[in-house]
């Protein structure tokens, strides 16, 4: 999985929004320590979390499984643009069979699938991938129908935009050891992709 922060709102946008409430612009230090502390104090300590919604982050996420994508989409205050399965399935039409299930073919399948820490689950995912390949290349099934046979482990690619308040909620829930392991990895990757000067707003959200 690869996560890149493509764009983000400067911190001073949030601090200026907060200062609008009290008309305290003269105390601003133009995004310096005073303003950073103000955002944390008002948004995190005093729990006026709506002020954090002025901060927005735009991520590119590569290699997330379709199963994890479903869980990510449950975080409603966010925008997703996902690689179409029509174009995804074009990639599979011309590849060779993934059988037999040997080391070479399992390694080839990793281009398309997210593997987990269970050999049998991974083998079943590759068999599902092979069935999908057969539908496309040997039976000429249209992509719109063939996608119903896509395994949940199939990798996807998306643009993901979310505000700081919603991102805090996501990191809090998905960094827990009760969350799906792939979602734990995603939460860590999203945090790591944030600009360093923004990470202090989210450090308390991480469960481990």
Curated annotation (Swiss-Prot):
Pathway: Pyrimidine metabolism; dTTP biosynthesis. It is an enzyme of class 2 (transferase). Its EC number is 2.1.1.148. FAD binds at residues 50, 74-76, 163-165, 169. GO terms for biological process: dTMP biosynthetic process; dTTP biosynthetic process; methylation. Gene3D superfamilies: 3.30.1360.170. HAMAP family: ThyX. Catalyzes the reductive methylation of 2'-deoxyuridine-5'-monophosphate (dUMP) to 2'-deoxythymidine-5'-monophosphate (dTMP) while utilizing 5,10-methylenetetrahydrofolate (mTHF) as the methyl donor, and NADPH and FADH(2) as the reductant. This is Flavin-dependent thymidylate synthase. The lineage of its organism: Bacteria, Pseudomonadati, Campylobacterota, Epsilonproteobacteria, Campylobacterales. The gene is thyX.
């Amino acid at each position: 999985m690869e996560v890149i922060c493509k764009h983000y709102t400067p911190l001073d946008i949030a601090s200026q929004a907060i200062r609008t409430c009290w008309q305290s612009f003269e105390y601003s230090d133009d995004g310096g320590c005073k303003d950073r502390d103000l955002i944390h104090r008002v948004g995190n300590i005093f729990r006026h979390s709506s002020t954090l919604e002025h901060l927005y982050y735009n991520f590119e996420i590569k290699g997330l499984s379709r199963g994890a994508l479903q869980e990510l989409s449950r975080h409603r205050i966010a925008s997703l643009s996902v690689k179409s399965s029509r174009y995804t399935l074009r990639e599979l039409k011309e590849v060779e069979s993934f059988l037999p299930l040997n080391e070479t073919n399992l390694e080839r399948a990793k281009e398309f699938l997210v593997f987990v820490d269970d050999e049998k689950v991974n083998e079943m995912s590759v068999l599902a991938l092979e069935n999908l390949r057969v539908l496309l290349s040997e039976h000429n099934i249209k992509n719109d129908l063939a996608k119903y046979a896509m395994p949940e482990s199939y990798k996807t690619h998306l643009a993901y935009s979310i505000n700081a308040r919603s991102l805090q909620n996501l990191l809090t829930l998905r960094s827990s050891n009760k969350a799906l392991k792939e979602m734990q990895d995603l939460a860590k990757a999203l945090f790591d992709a944030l600009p360093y000067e923004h990470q202090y707003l989210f450090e308390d959200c991480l469960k481990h």
